[in-house]
Amino acid sequence: MNNPPAEESLDPADWEAMRRLAHQAIDDGFDYLQHVRERPVWQPVPDRVVARLREPAPRLPQGAEFAYREFKEIVMPYSMGNTHPRVWTWFIGNGRTCAAVGDLLAAVLNPNMGGGNHIPNHVEAQVIDWCKEIVGFPAESSGLLVSGGSMANFVGLAVARN
């Protein structure tokens, strides 16, 4: 007699441990933003850090705690510095605490904005209406929220072409 396979899930094996890790990530992220002025805008990535990223893929699961520890050690210290107030290179927008919380909430919902009658579509429509009102566009004009400046430029070029 064959036993059916155990149900697989993407849920954490330990919700409380994942909750603690998420809270730690939020605390560390806020500390990173709060103390950004105390760090250099940018620093070169040491060869030893690049070497760690070139290691073969792990053959066994490493766990969320391990992945977060790696992020703190080899990613956070060597970012481009876009959140630093002395970054004047290009418009990318500074990472802000409200934006980080908003990104977290959006990731939790993970909405598909392609269609359907769910509240994120209504929120998007309202934000577009507010933007039209603020800049004085006609109420019947349309709009679209995109992921960032590169996508906005791409969409703008496509609209201009067509």
Segments from the language model and where they lie:
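N-terminal entrance/gating region of PLP-dependent enzymes' catalytic architecture
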Residues: 2-140
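Conserved beta-loop-alpha segment that forms the PLP phosphate-binding cup at the N-terminus of a helix
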Residues: 124, 128-129, 140-162
